[in-house]
């Protein structure tokens, strides 16, 4: 089992404190009327003046700032922002009032539940000391939040508001339970709003002109890694324009690297990918995504990443790039390259977590982990080492990408012996599928 990659434990809350949906306030509670400064303008000048006065116009989502003048069909009311300084002191507004056919006015605007943002509604619902959950991850039709202990009594209210404000884009809101500490990097979750019927957790995600189908409760997917997926895919595709390339994706998941590298997008494909994942569910969806995106030159496996490295060598498959996207423990898998028998020195791309200290310290910590697993020093110059921050994971942790050429010294090391792996699949040995 992998080490936990999150610091927090499962928040505990007394069930008796949890607010039910039946206790959610009536929407009329949020209804309010406010008087705003306004300009009474000719109908024919509406578009012109909205553009001229955009810096002082009143704005709110799903709410108009132009209304008909009920006393004169040839005129309209243009609502101005209720700012600290009188909106009528604005130079442009003064000029329009003094020299053109515009008049001072005021207008009562009704703001209802539908007009407020998620944050505005939750500020009215949650206690002052409770932090407002303002961010969430989208995975297909799912919204994924990670609520703190102080927010848990209001989890169903929070889910309802998020759902109300984001339909139909969001169909289900889930809250993460505990840490990511399973072998397959999945985590427990609970539905706090929306659809939870059959296949509620099976989603479709679009990325890099490809469509991915996956069960969010059974496989790992992080939408915040889209930029890193794009960066590495584009780097390899650009290199493949001048020569054919072979890529080994050792922890391929449902295919965020492997699928766009081999998908048919009207281009000549010069990339062959050997995609592997230990999770049988990831393997299942990888096969589906390979088929639905019409991928070519891809071989799919369901086995341990270390075994995959040894199998490629046993089959005399020369690899140009190796992708190891398992941040919690990918550097430790580099021990599989001891005694490497290939002629080429592949470029290896390892993703890992590192504590935040200083850039130099973080980078060196990642390099030390890689060197320790490889069994030799990873020299920055001779191994063409490149390190960069992929994303800010938490206040104390970054995710890094470490790319380097496999050191020649690994060839003289003793090849490690692999222990038989007990997986959740009942099928003996590795499963392999080829797509031409």
UniProtKB/Swiss-Prot annotation:
The keyword Repeat does not apply. Disulfide bonds: none annotated. S-adenosyl-L-methionine binds at residues 229, 277-278, 325. The keyword Cell wall biogenesis/degradation does not apply. GO terms for biological process: tRNA N1-guanine methylation. It catalyses: guanosine(37) in tRNA + S-adenosyl-L-methionine = N(1)-methylguanosine(37) in tRNA + S-adenosyl-L-homocysteine + H(+). GO terms for cellular component: mitochondrial matrix; nucleus. Transmembrane segments: none annotated. One of its GO terms (molecular function) is tRNA (guanine(37)-N1)-methyltransferase activity. It comes from the Eukaryota. It is found in: Mitochondrion matrix; Nucleus; Cytoplasm. Its EC number is 2.1.1.228. Specifically methylates the N1 position of guanosine-37 in various cytoplasmic and mitochondrial tRNAs. Methylation is not dependent on the nature of the nucleoside 5' of the target nucleoside. This is the first step in the biosynthesis of wybutosine (yW), a modified base adjacent to the anticodon of tRNAs and required for accurate decoding. HAMAP family: TRM5. Belongs to the class I-like SAM-binding methyltransferase superfamily. TRM5/TYW2 family. Monomer. This is tRNA (guanine(37)-N(1))-methyltransferase 1. It comes from Phaeodactylum tricornutum (strain CCAP 1055/1).
